[in-house]
Amino acid sequence: MINDIILLKQGEIVLKGLNRRSFEQKLMSNIKRRLEAIGKFKAYCLQSTVYIEPVDETSDMDAAFEAMTKVFGLASVNRAAGCEKDAKKIAELAIDYLREDMLAAKSFKCEAKRSDKSFPMTSIELAQFVGGELSEAYPDCEVDVHDPELTVHIEVRDLAAYVHAAPTPGAGGMPVGANGVAVTLLSGGIDSPVSTYMIAKRGVRLIPVHFFSFPYTSEQAKQKVIELARELTVYCGRMTIEVVPFTHIQEEIRAKCDEDYFTLIMRRFMMRIAQKIADANGAKAIVTGENLGQVASQTMEAMASTQAVTELPVLQPLIGMDKEEIITIARKIGTFDTSILPYEDCCTVFTPKHPRTRPKLSEVERAESVLDIDALVDEAVKGLEEVELRHE
């Protein structure tokens, strides 16, 4: 019986110094939590590699492998097989385990690595030996050390030897939660889910905040954003989305403020509310999907005016990206199809005909001074709805 196993290679974590252990602990916590939703597995970490083994016949290794490709902090994910550290047994395992790969390929080579230096063969000798055995077992697959279709990987480690084909790229980045907490403004568009994904990839646990303007925006629009957040849990892990009632604020802005400043004042309210939610949850930053010059409210002057109301750093991972680059990532992470569903969001409500694109901060402050800002912010925060989400 083949000893099926998944090998996970750490990414940036291996470059860490004294705090590396805390990053590894966060990674292991995230991996085990993801595996718990699938079945029973044994997961442990040795020499910068995480090992996942099935506990019994009900352990779904295919599902576990797929889930691990979405865990931040991993450079590669390898479906492998293990055996004792004996050259003949390693060759026999390779012949058996890689049968389909060898039959499909026209050429191959072997690469061996030994972290256990007590193994009696050098890495080159082991690769040559196993390669010879594979060539004899599969004579139609030629040896090509320069440009092979298939590379057979052999790893001799402290506990056992492992054989696998080409590794699957991991999600990269750093373990979610290793670099603190931030709130992320999540609309129903293409950009904000991508910005959320990109900051999560840097090890940040995220609290999505959505501004809901019923009846100007529909219940379907809210459910669309909740679905986007649920899709993001594949990468971000469990999240609680904060749905903020925004109708009264927008109506007050429309009734009392200069139309040219509607969008700017609305965005400033969003930042104030995001700051309140961040403070209540220990978050240290606000994430937005803004992209320089994409729309009228995303000029440098407009963004400076918007960000002036918060003390927290505002993270804008999309700031220099082209729209097509953003769409490519949205398709990759599975949010694009939901993002383009035809439901409006609060940013389309009461849109000014001639928005200010180069506002002066003093002008914006004067325009919004007719509002009871603190009362409106407190009312919105008190009325927010929390929806807990996890990957299903």
Model-based region annotation:
Residues 9, 164-166, 209-211, 244-247, ...:
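Generic beta-strand/beta-sheet core signal
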Residues 144, 242-244, 315:
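General small-molecule cofactor/ligand-binding pocket signal
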Residues 229-255, 343-346:
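A conserved beta-strand->alpha-helix junction
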Residues 341-392:
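The feature marks non-catalytic terminal segments
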Residues 189:
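Conserved G/P- and acidic residue-centered "switch" motifs that form tight phosphate/ATP-binding loops
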Residues 334-342:
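A short alpha-helix-loop-beta-strand transition element characteristic
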Residues 1-183, 193-239, 308, 356-361, ...:
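RNA-binding accessory domains that recognize and position tRNA/RNA substrates
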Residues 129-134, 167-179, 246, 250-251, ...:
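Active-site adenylate/phosphate-handling loop in enzymes that bind or generate adenylated species
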